Amino acid sequence: MKQYDVIVIGGGPSGLMAAIAAGEQGAGVLLIDKGNKLGRKLAISGGGRCNVTNRLPVEEIIKHIPGNGRFLYSAFSEFNNEDIIKFFENLGIQLKEEDHGRMFPVTDKAQSVVDALLNRLKQLRVTIRTNEKIKSVLYEDGQAAGIVTNNGEMIHSQAVIIAVGGKSVPHTGSTGDGYEWAEAAGHTITELFPTEVPVTSGEPFIKQKTLQGLSLRDVAVSVLNKKGKPIITHKMDMLFTHFGLSGPAILRCSQFVVKELKKQPQVPIRIDLYPDINEETLFQKMYKELKEAPKKTIKNVLKPWMQERYLLFLLEKNGISPNVSFSELPKDPFRQFVRDCKQFTVLANGTLSLDKAFVTGGGVSVKEIDPKKMASKKMEGLYFCGEILDIHGYTGGYNITSALVTGRLAGLNAGQYARS
């Protein structure tokens, strides 16, 4: 029967980080994963370039982790985003900063990040087993004691770190295996839901694919409550699809759509094409341009204002022919057209499923986890890190920051615990 100090289950970002941290404490570590290679989620992150962290101040990073980000304050006081940058630079990975604080390897290759982590594991003599499914985690006398593999092999250890991810992006291996093991240790799993996920709509223009493939730049997208008040607004790009809406602004708003759908059957999403101009000013500016070119068609005058497909769509919606000139322009429908430029509303009736989401909302309740150690409050020697925890952030280096920070602390503390 094999015996290790620490067993890490899951070879994603947080599991790799945990195995390295435990190994650096001098612990004998086994890293076990059911897939055929480690770091699969890392390798596809950031469009294959790997957005390893974000350089914004800690306060801002917490704001970009709307799902229990505040739980990470203690963790960040031990190991934060600047420490992540130093960690990678010490492994020989030079990073560069891009828009919104996003940090990428200078090589633009996610694989270089994965390789650097694997080399570090090798240096620390961490035992790696891939293609190995786990049946259960062993608990004896209120203590984590090892694992049982699918073929019945028992492997003992002083500490176990569960780093198996959530239920999103399942082709990388995160299929929700860990929730059962957490429950067996007495943990509560909060309700799971998709976040960072495209939104669906049954609007006729969506079904008819009128705007399919059309992308709007730097628009303000708001999710409205029952009273028509915005719950959240994100100013970014968005995209119309054959099933609804997608793109960065929509992905960020999606978790609020999921929550609001519990209160109303359809959730209004408002699109403001010109967030920096108020409606009256916009009306006056457009009206003035039309007035100054009285013979030109409305389509030709307003073409520079927005993409032609969107312009024609909003004109038709308000019963205005694209070929009318200023003298024939009906004023009331034109006012309504301007209002639609500022507050066109699409009714969302759902989102794509959890396996199509980028991030899982919900997970092991953070109330039952020591925030400085990532240790279970229910079971001695048990640790959690990464997306299995009830923590979720926006895309842009925030989830990976949470995964790497919680992984570092879980590994560090599990290593020290096992050695003591």
UniProtKB/Swiss-Prot annotation:
<dbReference type="InterPro" id="IPR055178">
    <property type="entry name" value="BaiN-like_dom"/>
</dbReference>
<dbReference type="Pfam" id="PF22780">
    <property type="entry name" value="HI0933_like_1st"/>
</dbReference>
<feature type="binding site">
    <location>
        <position position="399"/>
    </location>
    <ligand>
        <name>FAD</name>
    </ligand>
</feature>
<feature type="binding site">
    <location>
        <position position="387"/>
    </location>
    <ligand>
        <name>FAD</name>
    </ligand>
</feature>
<keyword id="KW-0285">Flavoprotein</keyword>
<dbReference type="Pfam" id="PF03486">
    <property type="entry name" value="HI0933_like"/>
</dbReference>
<feature type="binding site">
    <location>
        <position position="33"/>
    </location>
    <ligand>
        <name>FAD</name>
    </ligand>
</feature>
<feature type="binding site">
    <location>
        <position position="134"/>
    </location>
    <ligand>
        <name>FAD</name>
    </ligand>
</feature>
<feature type="binding site">
    <location>
        <position position="14"/>
    </location>
    <ligand>
        <name>FAD</name>
    </ligand>
</feature>
<dbReference type="InterPro" id="IPR023166">
    <property type="entry name" value="BaiN-like_dom_sf"/>
</dbReference>
<dbReference type="InterPro" id="IPR036188">
    <property type="entry name" value="FAD/NAD-bd_sf"/>
</dbReference>
<dbReference type="InterPro" id="IPR004792">
    <property type="entry name" value="BaiN-like"/>
</dbReference>
<feature type="binding site">
    <location>
        <position position="400"/>
    </location>
    <ligand>
        <name>FAD</name>
    </ligand>
</feature>
<keyword id="KW-0274">FAD</keyword>
<protein>
    <recommendedName>
        <fullName>Uncharacterized protein YtfP</fullName>
    </recommendedName>
</protein>
<comment type="similarity">
    <text>Belongs to the BaiN/RdsA family.</text>
</comment>
